[in-house]
Amino acid sequence: MAYDTNNIFAKILRGEIPCIKLFEDEHTLAFMDIMPQAEGHALVIPKEAATTLFELSDAAAAACMATVRRIGTAQKKGLGAEGIVLMQLNGEAAGQTVPHLSLIHI
């Protein structure tokens, strides 16, 4: 799966599609999923164009994990969650449907 600059996450990053932002910094964006599987279902995406984890720079990967930890901490505190699920799919064989890396909090 090649990177597509018109994928839905790229459009969200460019502000072409609205989202409910939870957090944004220089390297990442965290927002609510439009079809949540559970209360607090959020996505963390890098601003770097990368389809899979294997294409992501080390700096962007570190920034993503810092944002994941920030959002997970907020979910635990704000929702009273005792734990979170963190999922990341790489490639069509793994179930990835959008050609932009995402980390999923449920």
Please give the residue ranges for each predicted region.
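HIT superfamily nucleotide-processing domains
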Residues: 1-104
